[in-house]
A protein has these predicted regions:
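Non-catalytic tandem-repeat scaffold regions and their flanking low-complexity/translocation tails
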Residues: 1-303
Length: 303
């Protein structure tokens, strides 16, 4: 559809189906990846042209998919020399903006495709980026793709271990541990049969300094699952509250709400659902912290 009718038509169709089909809700982020890949090919790998047609719907997957195509077109022989310039346009337009973030994160997805899902080789590609902020966002794309690729029939991930659920986070350098743990909970939750209480328990045992981000990651998963389940409004807030309240450690519950709020904004590209969740919290300190996170993340996305 992108080639024949354009990016906007493809998104209009996707948004229409999103309201009707549970499969589309569950797979929406990956579907927007496909639109982004096609758009990048249509615009000859030009990042500004591709981004000008973009849409943040379903977690900005369009931009991540676009970068997968851009990296693939550059190729392994040239990518390390050119990587630092790939995100130059969004960086110069507004450093650390949402477009800049999506570009750097998308590069991580692209490196995984280019290097056959080799996590550590892809992280070495992220290492060539001169900005620490870009390296962090790039690594997040690597770890996200690694978890997604568990179900890749043609090239499943080699860097996931059921008996070591937080691998490879345990083995990557400190700079990349937080981006890893916040995404690895998706895999851990799946392996635990969506038992949120069990994953809270496992997060409580990870290495010192990274338990809070593990709880945030689980909050992301709670919000994502609520969307996939088709819950909305008060039912969605109730589902998220119920799951996050399973945390037993002092910091577990509020950090779970932080992750859920950020993911709701990420998924819907607005703060309606996030604020509804915050307002539903009965503890005043949690409610205030929740609303503050919502405001800060919305401001971050508007940069």
């Amino acid at each position: 559809m992108v080639y024949n009718s354009g990016v906007q038509a493809a998104f209009a169709d996707l948004k229409d189906e999103f309201t009707k089909e549970q499969f589309v809700k569950a797979s929406c982020h990956q579907l927007t990846h496909s639109i982004g890949r096609a758009a990048a090919e249509l615009y000859g790998g030009d990042v500004p042209s591709t981004y000008s047609q973009g849409d943040d719907f379903c977690g900005s997957g369009y931009y991540h998919g676009a970068m997968q195509s851009v990296v693939a077109n550059i190729g392994a022989d040239k990518i390390l020399d050119e990587a630092d310039n790939i995100c130059a346009a969004p960086r110069e337009q507004q450093d650390q903006s949402l477009d800049h973030r999506n570009c750097a994160h998308g590069m991580g997805h692209g490196f995984m495709g280019l290097y056959g899902n080799e996590v550590f080789e892809s992280l070495e590609a992220c290492d060539v980026l001169s900005e620490g902020w870009e390296r962090e966002k790039c690594s997040g794309g690597v770890f996200m793709e690694n978890v997604i690729d568990e179900d890749n029939p043609s090239n499943p991930s080699k860097y996931l271990k059921a008996d070591e659920p937080f691998y490879p986070c345990t083995e990557v350098k400190s700079e990349y541990k937080s981006p890893c743990y916040v995404r690895q909970t998706n895999y851990v939750l799946k392996k635990q049969g969506d038992d949120f209480a069990k994953v809270f328990e496992l997060c409580g045992k990870v290495e010192d300094g990274f338990r809070p981000i593990c709880y945030v990651g689980l909050g992301n998963n709670v919000a994502t699952q609520s969307t996939k389940n088709g819950t909305t409004g008060g039912d969605q807030a109730e589902f998220i509250r119920g799951a996050c309240m399973l945390g037993q450690e002092t910091e577990a519950r509020p950090k779970c709400f932080v992750g859920a709020v950020r993911q709701l904004i990420f998924n819907y590209d607005n703060d309606v659902q996030a604020k509804a969740l915050c307002e539903s919290l009965t503890r005043a300190d949690w409610r205030a912290a929740c609303l503050q996170v919502s405001e800060e993340y919305m401001a971050e996305r508007r940069r």
